[in-house]
Regions:
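Long, contiguous binding/interaction regions
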Residues: 2-80, 84, 91, 169, ...
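A structural-propensity feature for long, helix-poor, extended segments
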Residues: 123-168
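Disorder-to-helix initiation segments
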Residues: 78, 82, 90, 94-101, ...
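Short amphipathic alpha-helical segments and their helix-coil junctions
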Residues: 81-92, 201-210
Length: 210
């Protein structure tokens, strides 16, 4: 669908946003939906700009955000396999619980709506509607990303409350600090599922449109 740049090279590191914008630019030039997975957008940017023609281009080693994520050794639920996540939920650990599961179910709903939008964007006979479906897919990807984030955020909020219960309470000062921390942690633990509900509700608009 056009001439592709060959032999481009990036010296040093590159912000993820730059590759995302480049990938979406080339997708629009091809009249394709931009509401696809981030990794696929990056792959399209790399290929379209010829970043892997001169030598292999590994986004994990060249993109700033990916390097920072690799240095973060904290275990995330969303990095587990479906089987592993289910088994972790079934274990004797109190987390992940219903909040994380609800966020993941919402993410799957957003993923399904986004899938239909992407399929529709290049369906034969609907060529003049590709931008409409691309916009729906973009919205679906945004909701999907937020709900996946909330999977871990809900468990993190629960763990904050558990951490407060471990705080000392021998003196009046310690009791006051513990009480204040518990109030703050409990408030946040209610705000996260509220965000999940609001975000998941937004998925219905996409599903209805599809």
């Amino acid at each position: 669908r056009g001439v592709r740049v060959t032999g481009t090279e990036i010296v040093g590191l590159v912000p993820k946003r730059a590759l995302i914008e480049a990938g979406k630019y080339f997708l629009r030039k091809q009249r394709r939906s931009t509401g696809i997975a981030e990794q696929e957008i990056v792959r399209i940017a790399v290929r379209s700009m010829g970043l892997d023609d001169l030598k292999p281009f590994d986004p994990a080693e060249k993109v700033i955000e990916y390097l920072l994520e690799a240095e973060d050794k904290q275990k995330r639920l969303i990095d587990m396999t479906c089987k592993g996540f289910a088994e972790e939920t079934a274990s004797e650990s109190p987390a992940p619980g219903g909040g994380s599961i609800a966020a993941y179910m919402g993410a799957l709903g957003a993923a399904l709506g986004t899938m239909v939008a992407n399929l529709s964007s290049h369906k034969a006979g609907w060529d003049d509607r590709w931008e409409e479906f691309s916009d729906w897919a973009d919205r679906g990807q945004a909701l999907l990303g937020e709900l996946l984030h909330l999977v871990d955020e809900d468990t993190a909020a629960f763990n904050r409350i558990m951490a407060v219960f471990a705080m000392p309470k021998s003196t009046d000062e310690e009791k006051a600090a513990r009480s204040a921390a518990l109030q703050e942690a409990t408030l946040y633990a209610t705000q996260v599922p509220l965000r999940t509900m609001k975000t998941a509700f937004g998925v219905f608009e996409i599903v209805r449109a599809m």
